[in-house]
Amino acid sequence: MGLSLEQKKAMVQEVAAVAQEALTAVSAEYRGLTAGEMDQLRAQAREQGVYLRVVKNTLARRAVAGTEFECMTEGFYGPLLLAFSQDDPGAAARLVRDFRKKNESLVVRNVAFGGTLYGPEHLDRLASLPTRDEALSKLMATMRAPVQKLATTTNEVPGKLVRTLAAVRDAKEAA
């Protein structure tokens, strides 16, 4: 049984609202996946904060129209699955990449980031982006390194002086 017009409009509005706020998107063909595998993928998407939706191609084109993911419409054919990253730019790509390791039936069509369309070969690059927490910790470590070096150098001067004086004292006592 097909979707009613109202259901289609609601789906387009829902996907459009998510696409408007999303950072990245991945489109994939799910042909060959069982219902159980799709359930696993959906559960993993919920855990990772990724919006995952099976959408008819025409509805998907309408949903992404006017968003930065409009560039993906050429790849909307066949059984289509859309994954949007809400908070972490690499989340959708990591989800699809990790799921593909176990299920080769999932075929990546396109990856979009910042209004630019990338091919499926860029999935790993997008998936390797650090999470927000990882990026912040790297930034903090980078900012902390010069200050820590300065503190170490500043503390080393008095220590070196004390060691030099101790060596002179030991030399005088020995003489």
Curated annotation (Swiss-Prot):
GO biological process: translation
GO molecular function per UniProt: large ribosomal subunit rRNA binding; structural constituent of ribosome
UniProtKB keywords: Ribonucleoprotein, Ribosomal protein, RNA-binding, rRNA-binding
GO cellular component: large ribosomal subunit
Matches recorded under InterPro entries: Ribosomal_uL10, Ribosomal_uL10-like_sf, Ribosomal_uL10_bac, Ribosomal_uL10_bac_type, Ribosomal_uL10_CS_bac
CDD domains per the UniProt record, alphabetical: Ribosomal_L10
Entry-linked Gene3D superfamilies: 3.30.70.1730, 6.10.250.2350
The protein's role, per its UniProt record: Forms part of the ribosomal stalk, playing a central role in the interaction of the ribosome with GTP-bound translation factors.
Record note on quaternary structure: Part of the ribosomal stalk of the 50S ribosomal subunit. The N-terminus interacts with L11 and the large rRNA to form the base of the stalk. The C-terminus forms an elongated spine to which L12 dimers bind in a sequential fashion forming a multimeric L10(L12)X complex.
Entry's family note: Belongs to the universal ribosomal protein uL10 family.
Name of the protein this chain belongs to: Large ribosomal subunit protein uL10
Gene name in the database record: rplJ
